[in-house]
Amino acid sequence: MTGVQTCALPILSLLTVIIVFGVVFWSSRKMTIKPKGKQNVLEFIYEFVNSTISQSLGKFTKNYSLLLFVIFTFVFTANNLGLLVSVKSEHYNFWTSPTSNFGVTITLSLIITLISHIEGIRKKGFKGYLKGYLSPYPAMLPMNILEQLTNLASLALRLFGNIYSGEVLTGLILKLVTWSVFAAPVSFALNLVWVAFSAFIGFIQAYVFIILSSNYIGDKVNEE
C-alpha cells in the first residue's frame, strides 16, 4: 500500500520460514516407498522443481534441486501471505507479503548471485571463472560485468514489482467499501476474483524466480 510503512516485516518473514518448515516437516513424516496423501503432494512439488531446473543445470541438477525447492516454497508462500488478511492502521501495515518489500527480494537475489559465483569458482577454478568474463573476446569484459549487475537487479525488481503492485490494487479494491454501502458487494466480488488471480501470479513469480536462478547458477557451473 502506497505510503504505508511496513512495521512487521521481520516477523512475517520469520512466519513464512516457520510455515514452510512446518508444512515440509509434517508432509515428510512417516514416509513410505509408495507415496500417498501429503507425501505425494510434497514429492510432486519437489519433482516439479527438479524438472523445471534440469534444463538449465543439466548434470548438476541434483546438486541444487533441494536448494531451489526451498527457495520456491519460500517465495511462493511469501508471495501469498499478504492475501490471507488485511491488518493495518493509518500509518502502519501489520500484515503484508514479505516479497512486496524490496529489501526481501534483493536479499533473495543476492543469495542466488552469491551462490552462482561461489559455485562457478568451485567448479571451474578461479582462472576458469575469470575466463568467462573475457568470452567471447576480452573487449566484452565491461558488458559481461554489467550483465551480472542487471541480472541481480532484474531478479529482485521483477518479483518485488509484481507482488507489491498486486497488494496495492487489493487495497484500492477494499477501499470501495468506504464509498457507499452499494459498493460493498462489488468490492467483495472484485476482491475474491483478484485474490484468486494474485495467488496464481504468486505461483508464476515463484516459478519464474527458480527458472532464472537455475539459469544464473547453470551459466556459472556448466562447461562453455
Predicted regions and their residues:
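Short, exposed "boundary/linker" segments that immediately precede the start
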Residues: M1-G3
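Selective transmembrane helix interface/packing segments
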Residues: T6-E224
